Amino acid sequence: MRILFTILKDLGYPVSQEVQDYYSKIQFWNDWWKGYVQEFHKYQIKNESGNSREVKRKQMRMAKKICEDWADLLLNDKTRILVECNEHGTDITQEFLTGDKEDQNGGVLGNSKFWKLGNKAVEREFAQGTVCFYLQLVKPTVNKGQLSAQSVQIKAIKDAQKIVPLTYDEEDISEIALASEYTQNGERFMYIQVFKQEQEGYQIYNHYFKINNVAGDAVGYERVSAPNGEAISYKLPCKPFVILKPNIENNIADVPLGMSIYANAIDMLESCDLAYDNLFMDTLLGKKKIFMDQALLSMKPTAYALNDKGEKVPVKQEPDVGATLEKSLYVSTGTQVSPDKPRLFEEYNPSLRVDENKENVQFNLNLLSSKCGLGQNRYQFSIQNMTTATQVRASNKELTESVWKQRIAIQDALTELTRSIIILGKEKCHISGLDPDVRITIQFDDTMFSDEEAERLRMLQEISAGILQKWEYRVRYYGEDEETAREMTGETENPADRIQSRFFPQEGTQIEEGPEGEA
């Protein structure tokens, strides 16, 4: 990070010390996401000889699991972006964005593999606090000073340490620098894009640098030309980037970057790993042991070594318990196993404390899950636990409320990004019929909050009560169109037409009589 800050300062974009210091916290959160924090997971123990050796604490890696779950809840391939304007404009704009309205595997989003990219980006957002989506022109050309392109592509910077805010206020980051590194012919390079706001749009500056190792840890750099002849700068008519941050207030530092969803739950992450490590150690140390009299063990031949004075001294002898059995199974007790009972061996089977360890792990999982906004019962340390969507909805109100809260930020970002895509499509790709003023709707995946079995049963009950018709059931759950569904159920007449003909007949039409001659 130091080299990035140095380059930005030399380019005329100094970064405040407070913002620079914040990146150490991002690195700490990223270590937890990876599952290994050296100062916590590495420790030392002493063996029977009094010598210390380094060991590694066992990990549940719950930080990554939490971020994966948040990403699946907020942005996945069942999320849909829909636009609505005049009929012709809607079709053209929707096709440019997503290819079609249902699958949405085409257009700008499909060509950018956005649903896969977006899901991974949201996972990193909740781990590190910040990610950035930005727009890039596909096959740009300049003709008579005018920039045009074939299409638009969505890219992402998922490493928060490569996102540097330049101009910002309490609500938004308006100017930013994005960095990425690449290696060519064994040499290290850095590419920096600077997005500067102007009166009408944004000016984008591209900078390329070769990173040189000077001496020791010192790093230098030199400016190089663009590898593929990219433009040094160009202008776009809209804001070509959006910043995603978890929708929680930053209580760690007054900076424009976001904070990890588990930033205030580090103690809980440590407790989970401690509990799991204790379970592992109890299992490891709970093996059967046989304490044996020395007379039952064959000894290796006496070995000698020279001391500092050149004298031969015997080396400590170890019991030869055989290569096929684990050494820790047998423990030599010298000449007597027990002072009270003269015997040659004694078996010892320690308790594994399975129930206590499971309860300890579950308790810490509940604390962690609740602290990260997923509700207390999100994770069950048991393979025998199954919960229906109705039970989730009823027992985990905290999760439901947290999801709605986080979707606000996702919806705002996707709406802004979508509108910028449409503007670039119209202004730079020259696609006629695109309407930047469309109404944009983000449809999120709500399957986790719905219980299809219960909904089917309720719909059947409403059909029996006469509230709904049978064809409506086939349309919803069999995917048939209305005409086919009516034909399959024999309900070919539209109820509205039946009411019209019965109670409001046209002139010359006889009113249908009831069973007792009443109209």
Please provide the spans of the model-predicted regions.
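Extended, helix-rich architectural segments
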Residues: M1-I173, P515-A519
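Extended, charged amphipathic alpha-helical segments
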Residues: E230-A394, E398, T447
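Activation/maturation switch segments at domain boundaries
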Residues: R458-A519
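C-terminal amphipathic alpha-helical
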Residues: F114-G129, Y134, M281, R353-S450
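Extended, regular secondary-structure scaffolds
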Residues: A127, C132-I261
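Short acidic alpha-helix initiation/capping motifs at coil-to-helix transition points
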Residues: E356-V361, S450-A454, E462-Q469
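Short coil/turn segments at secondary-structure boundaries
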Residues: A121, L135-Q136, T283-F291, R378-I383, ...
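Charge-rich, acidic-biased intrinsically disordered regions
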Residues: V19, K144-S151, S298-L325, T387, ...
